[in-house]
């Protein structure tokens, strides 16, 4: 065998070995979950009807419900990973979870770092305020006035939307998204701008509060599940969601959690 040809064969063999090692190193997230039998799901526990941490320390809500069903479809054990809106993307970068399910809105900032599943809900920001003040806060122009206090929870799209649209009104940051609506009832803030689905639910839980035109929110947003950049896992989650939607399961479970008897005393 000519020397040059022998060198070529050796080089090709080395490349084949490197390619094989690379493929093994690039084991998909889906394969990892199937092999470990564990699905790590991040959730905030502060966002009814999607995710709520109970007084007993467990979690309830639409996305917690769906997380359990996703784990079962994979033959895996569900492990809930607590996170928060300010820490969500940091926890993602640190690989603390396999998927985040917590009423998460799709936005380009998050999309630059992660994948999203197909959307499961269309939504948008709308005000919630005392029913006696509903006519006063119909537009962003009416809201963005000196003397108006808009309350926000830190680190999520609610704060981002408020800071982008309010230049004259005062923005009050409240650290607890569970008790934040009671602050409006208690007169510590005039309103909050949040997702229409949350505004509707909280107006039911707090009879003093009214969701302002939730059927016509100020902007457009979709909710989806936050995923690592793994094509195989994304395709699996997308197909699982598609089946749940087409079978009516998504609608049925959402109706259940919207009608659920959530604790209401001071937002707890």
Swiss-Prot record:
Any Pfam family matching the protein: SBP_bac_3
Site positions for Important for catalysis:
179
Q: Name the principal localization, coarsely classed.
A: periplasm
The record's listing under CDD domains reads: PBP2_PheC (cd01069)
Judging by the UniProt lineage, the source's domain of life is Bacteria
What does the record list as GO biological process? L-phenylalanine biosynthetic process
Concerning Gene3D superfamilies, the annotation shows:
Periplasmic binding protein-like II
Q: Where in the cell is it found?
A: Periplasm
Catalytic reaction list: prephenate + H(+) = 3-phenylpyruvate + CO2 + H2O; L-arogenate + H(+) = L-phenylalanine + CO2 + H2O
Give any Gene Ontology cellular component.
periplasmic space
PROSITE patterns membership: SBP_BACTERIAL_3
Q: From which residue to which does the signal peptide run?
A: 1-25
Q: What is its EC number?
A: 4.2.1.51, 4.2.1.91
Q: Which UniProt keywords apply?
A: Amino-acid biosynthesis, Aromatic amino acid biosynthesis, Lyase, Multifunctional enzyme, Periplasm, Phenylalanine biosynthesis, Signal
| Keyword ATP-binding (UniProt) | no
Q: How does it assemble?
A: Homodimer.
Function as written in the Swiss-Prot or TrEMBL entry: Forms alternative pathway for phenylalanine biosynthesis. Can catalyze two reactions: prephenate dehydratase and arogenate dehydratase. May have a role in chemotaxis or transport.
Looking up PANTHER family in the UniProt record yields: AMINO-ACID-BINDING PROTEIN YXEM-RELATED (PTHR35936:SF19), MEMBRANE-BOUND LYTIC MUREIN TRANSGLYCOSYLASE F (PTHR35936)
What is the name listed in the Swiss-Prot or TrEMBL entry for this protein? Cyclohexadienyl dehydratase
What organism does this protein naturally occur in?
Pseudomonas aeruginosa (strain ATCC 15692 / DSM 22644 / CIP 104116 / JCM 14847 / LMG 12228 / 1C / PRS 101 / PAO1)
Question: What phylogenetic lineage does the species belong to?
Answer: Bacteria, Pseudomonadati, Pseudomonadota, Gammaproteobacteria, Pseudomonadales
């Amino acid at each position: 065998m000519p020397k040059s040809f022998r060198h070529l064969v050796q080089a090709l063999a080395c490349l084949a070995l490197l390619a094989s090692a690379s493929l093994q190193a690039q084991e998909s997230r889906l394969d990892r979950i199937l092999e470990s039998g564990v699905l790590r799901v991040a959730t905030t526990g502060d966002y009814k009807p999607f995710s709520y941490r109970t007084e007993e320390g467990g979690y309830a809500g639409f996305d917690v419900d769906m997380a359990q069903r996703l784990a079962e479809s994979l033959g895996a054990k569900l492990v809930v990973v607590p996170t928060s809106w300010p820490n969500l993307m940091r926890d993602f970068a640190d690989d603390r979870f396999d998927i985040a399910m917590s009423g998460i809105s799709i936005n380009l900032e998050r999309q630059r770092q992660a994948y999203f599943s197909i959307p499961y809900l269309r939504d948008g920001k709308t005000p919630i305020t005392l029913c006696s003040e509903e006519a006063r806060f119909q537009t962003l122009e009416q809201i963005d006035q000196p003397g108006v206090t808009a309350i926000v929870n830190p680190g999520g799209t609610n704060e981002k939307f408020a800071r982008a649209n309010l230049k004259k009104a005062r923005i009050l940051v409240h650290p607890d998204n569970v008790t934040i609506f009671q602050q409006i009832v208690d007169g510590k803030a005039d309103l909050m701008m949040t997702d229409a689905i949350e505004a509707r639910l909280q107006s039911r839980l707090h009879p003093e509060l009214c969701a302002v035109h939730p059927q016509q929110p100020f902007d457009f947003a979709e909710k989806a599940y936050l995923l690592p950049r793994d094509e195989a896992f994304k395709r699996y989650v997308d197909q699982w969601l598609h089946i749940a939607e087409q079978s009516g399961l998504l609608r049925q479970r959402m109706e259940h959690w919207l009608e659920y008897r959530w604790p209401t005393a001071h937002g707890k």
